Amino acid sequence: MTVQEINKQIYRMELKWKIKPFEALTVNELYDLLQLRSEIFVVEQNCVYLDLDGKDKKALHLIGEYEGKIVAYSRLFDAGISFDNASIGRVVVDANYRDKKFGHDLMREAVAQIQSNFGKDKITIGAQLYLKKFYESHGFVQTSEMYLEDDIPHIEMIRE
């Protein structure tokens, strides 16, 4: 291991996690998480489809903050809302923080929160195809052919 790799581990940034139902989100939290989702899912991905799909009120919202700023976020659902199994969606990390491995932290925390809040181990996601290896590194396995969602290639993946 190089000195640089050791220093990265020593000075690893830690996120502060919050898990909240929709009703418990503050106005500022809601604004900030919707802004982050829009920056990534609409602007960065050039996707002119509505991000607000009516499911936010049914989700637990997992928020990762660094120095008071929301930099990681996902929605968590019990079984029967998005898929037959519990599910994770709208997985997003602020573009300015992607080199910090916050996406991996977010997925580990999301899986733990689903197990804690819903008592479920089987989790389904609708993953953007280009992130297949990322999700495989968290135990997810592809279970469908590629399909288009909002003109973006996706696959269904399950973690058991």
Where are the regions a protein language model picked out?
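Short amphipathic alpha-helix that is part of the acyltransferase structural core
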Residues: 2-51, 56-61, 66-69
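A conserved beta-turn-beta hairpin within the catalytic core of GNAT-like acetyltransferases
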Residues: 79-88, 98, 117-121, 151-153
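Conserved beta-strand in the GNAT
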Residues: 63, 69-78, 85-87, 92
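Conserved catalytic-core motifs of GNAT/GCN5-like acyltransferases
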Residues: 124-126, 136, 141-156
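A short beta-turn/loop motif at secondary-structure boundaries
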Residues: 52-57, 80, 148-150
